[in-house]
């Protein structure tokens, strides 16, 4: 959490929320995988930015899905640098899906000072959900996290970044104060109810990531333009066709495929 509100020149500080998914010790063709050594370089960069009195834009780290690499690789590196992150958990996968964290790991992350938020129950796109499905993905997920961890859960990360008015209304009704999206943009301190994030890919090396934090960053402006183009493509193609195209272009692996709220029956009481 940030305590400063301005830099040494009196300029108001802003945050750039960064979205990670999975870390691996070796390279992967799946674009959402970041190498462990690469993540360490990112953290060294972020520590330097945070420690500079001249910085106007500060990094905030988030993880989606709850992959076990978040605990095995990311958590020790974060602890070494005194950096706290925000982990959004796909609740139905917890303790059930191979390669993803169980409740003991989540409790240890929480005890280390990291924040825990919800990322649905099955990772189904919320725009595809009925009212009953939204109850599972939003309310059941939040209540299960609260019961298992003993803390209030007030943050939700949208699977696939997809939302519409119905989804936002359901999130608010379910008790979430902050909704984290995949819209690449900077945020005020503290952020508003809709929080944008920049999706970090394996191709993004530390030198390029550094350019995002430059004043009037051309790299960040390009990502914002690309997001608007992709959003227009989603509107034309529809979610399902766009998701197939996304999987092909990003070399998505089976773990990246969304689930189905009917899976709730298999995991709800464990």
Locations of the language-model features?
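Short glycine- and acidic-rich boundary segments immediately preceding or forming the N-terminal edge
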Residues: 1-47
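Membrane-proximal basic amphipathic "stem/tether" segments
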Residues: 1-14, 196-270
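Metal-dependent polysaccharide deacetylase catalytic core of the NodB/CE4 family, i.e.
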Residues: 14-30, 58-59, 67, 79-167, ...
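Short, acidic/polar
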Residues: 36-38, 42, 70-72, 130
């Amino acid at each position: 959490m940030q305590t400063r509100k301005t830099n040494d020149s009196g300029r108001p500080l802003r945050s750039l929320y960064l979205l990670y998914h999975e870390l691996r010790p070796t390279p992967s063709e799946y674009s959402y995988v970041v190498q462990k050594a690469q993540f360490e370089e990112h953290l060294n960069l972020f520590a330097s930015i945070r420690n500079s009195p001249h910085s106007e834009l500060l990094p905030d780290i988030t993880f989606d899905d709850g992959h076990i690499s978040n605990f095995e690789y990311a958590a020790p590196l974060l602890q070494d640098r005194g950096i706290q992150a925000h982990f959004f958990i796909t609740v139905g996968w917890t303790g059930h899906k191979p390669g993803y964290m169980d409740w003991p790991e989540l409790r240890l992350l929480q005890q280390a000072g990291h924040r825990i938020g919800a990322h649905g129950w099955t990772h189904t796109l919320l725009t595809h959900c009925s009212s009953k499905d939204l109850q599972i993905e939003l309310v059941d997920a939040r209540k299960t996290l609260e019961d298992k961890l003993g803390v209030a859960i007030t943050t939700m990360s949208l699977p696939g970044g997809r939302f519409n008015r119905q989804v936002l209304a359901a999130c608010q009704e379910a008790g979430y104060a902050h909704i984290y999206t995949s819209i690449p943009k900077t945020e005020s301190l503290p952020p508003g109810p809709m929080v944008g994030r920049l999706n970090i890919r394996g191709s993004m090396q530390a030198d390029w990531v550094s350019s995002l934090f430059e004043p009037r960053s051309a790299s960040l402006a390009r990502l914002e333009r690309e997001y608007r183009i992709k959003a227009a493509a989603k509107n034309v193609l529809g979610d399902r066709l766009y998701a197939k195209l996304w999987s092909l272009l990003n070399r998505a692996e089976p773990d990246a495929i969304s689930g189905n709220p009917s899976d709730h029956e298999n995991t709800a009481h464990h």
